Amino acid sequence: VALRKDIWRPAIVMATAEAIVARGSIQGFPLMWLPPMGSFQFLADPFGLWRDGRLYVFVETYDYRVRIGAIEVLVYDADFRLVDRQPVLNEAWHLSYPLVFEAEGETWMLPEAHRSNRLTLYRAVDFPTRWEPAQIIELDHVAVDATPVFHGGRWWLFYTSADREPDKMSALHVAYADRLAGPWTPHPMNPVRVDVASARPGGMPLVIDGRIVLPVQDCSRTYGGAIRPLTMTVLTPDRFEAEVGDAMVPPASSAPFVEGLHTLSTAGPVTLVDMKRTELSLHGLSIEAVREAKKLRPKRRASVRG
């Protein structure tokens, strides 16, 4: 059990994602925090959609005592006042990374749910609070943080593999399809990138100068330590090349949330991010104390039978 627990807090940055990528930092841009949570609870993984002058921010909500993430929506008016907050999706398994987007005349959510051993695409039945499973996306691996984008006349899907714990952070895969529902074809070069500092998706893709720019997590120092822009310089059904930019870390002004930044989601004129601090876990400490006490106990001498 970890002695310290990650506590994330999302914020709305008053700048476009393109401006943030160009600057290489959120430093200097005004930001507004989402509401705080209670002890050992957090919100994370913000994704947003504007509709009728309102910003709908979808987030993971997590409580360390329950240990299963669920999805909520926070609704902001044009002046960024919080006007509503509702639960939107709960399953028997952990949910996070509620990537919401509009395509093919519908509103979709593709949440991270690798503990269900499948990737489920949800369709909004009554936006923003009611969603139904619409499609199981079949891939070469159980996907982590699957992130779709339509570009160059086809769909692309970026994800890491849930096969092994290190792969979740470091093994980037790609698949492509003509339609969102598939069928999806895994890229022949998978994993197209193996690097703990620039593989796991961390937000909504951008298209800058005709190239896909995928926010990816730098987990080299700590989980979700920073975001880097990964620019696809060559992306075809049989080729993949990419260049990675510098790490974007929390500014000092976001203290105490300065220990990680692992989402960068474009939302029109603003950008959604989340930053972390860590909190000392008494439960973790108590387990560690018991473990140390056992080490100090004198070992019994084995009895010898004659």
Predicted regions and their residues:
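Carbohydrate-active catalytic/glycan-binding domains of CAZyme proteins
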Residues: 1-306
